[in-house]
């Protein structure tokens, strides 16, 4: 299975798939001597027209890889590409009175080879005009671009767009769509982190993963003083097409996106991923194997959180496994799920470049009935922080056949905290380490005689204090091995309880161990469910080596 390798921050290596297939619907025109950057002929547009466009496009053959870029763009380095700036005086909504939002476009070049068309829409008349590429929209600075090669290239298109919000107009963007169908947003820290995608196809199958492209965007002209905007997108790939509507609310402390899509399958699809998101987890409190660095933790997200259709809340800490892992969690009409970054303490990261303590969480809230399916979680081994190695999405139970049509509605919350949380006790942190000794010994003058792995899970909130006098009972289920030395410890600094147990193997198997735990009081659950996957070492590694030199 081939995986994309995006350069974090600039998203510099976009996946290569599909074309727009809409050239016959929107003709080009000569540049207009008009302050409005939209220079194409007017055409009627609304979401129903886009749906028909996507439906008709699915009846035609996919047009394949993008055409070659001019040499001056194809050979750019990331540094050169990032030095190109859009001219803020020619921004999309520059002429809107009392504008609180503005949009700029990304230049084609380097790994961004798929032409993306941009249109400006008057929401009152439903008339759209294309915005054609021309070099004067950009400042090339020290990029070394030979602009003579770009003359007359009005159909070159753009790579994507980003949106700014007052008072940081033209300075710090809050929303970005760039590369394939990837997009991101920030909270009030202005720190980008994980990404979402329009669609995921064959992420974990025996087929090559397919990366659909957003090939065209239509922007409703933003209203004066508004902090909400609407953009429509056409998605295209070898297996499917789609019409998307994004209503994006740029609030003070978060960005909320209302997403509606209509999908049209060209081919049978083995694995269709709805509301996919991509993140990075190198190491954290539970996984220290790859943390030979000055930074205690390195991750964009620390857990997958799920609010199941039956009301159960699940916390699944993320891993950086030595072998690729894919887990599918069955559900029926899920209430929500997301990849969260809940630890906001700088001292836990000590990173003044990545600022992982400021990175947003992403929560998906279905807005229509999604039916039966699974929440898929893929964890890919990584040696550092430059590669996204976590993928999560909803996979419908129903198999996708050529000619099938689907419609999904959901809301995305980009924020420090998800909009909802479990009313019961919640998992704060998961830690692992050497086991087989009494707490506080750690380990003393000699190592334990028998090898074991210790797990410590901290719970906070809910009714833990009220339950404590009645008795808190951890309910632990393991797919293999045994849990011993189970302890319940009150942790005053967090005003919560730590459930600690040692895992002992009962076989030589190195298969992943699925762990499940929740807290119970007098027969009732009083916490969310903790799920974890542990990877036992080989039998010959299950021993403690004392390598001290005493003389």
From Swiss-Prot:
Signal peptide: 1-32
NCBIfam families recorded: TAT_signal_seq
Native source species: Shigella dysenteriae serotype 1 (strain Sd197)
Keyword Ligase in record: no
InterPro entries per UniProt: Gal_mutarotase_sf_dom, GH-type_carb-bd, Glucan_biosyn_MdoD, Glucan_biosyn_MdoG/MdoD, Glucan_biosyn_MdoG_C, Ig-like_fold, Ig_E-set, TAT_signal
Task of the protein: Probably involved in the control of the structural glucose backbone of osmoregulated periplasmic glucans (OPGs).
One BP term from GO: beta-glucan biosynthetic process
Alphabetical list of HAMAP family matching this protein: MdoD_OpgD
Entry similarity comment: Belongs to the OpgD/OpgG family.
Gene encoding the protein: mdoD
Protein name, as recorded: Glucans biosynthesis protein D
GO cellular component: outer membrane-bounded periplasmic space
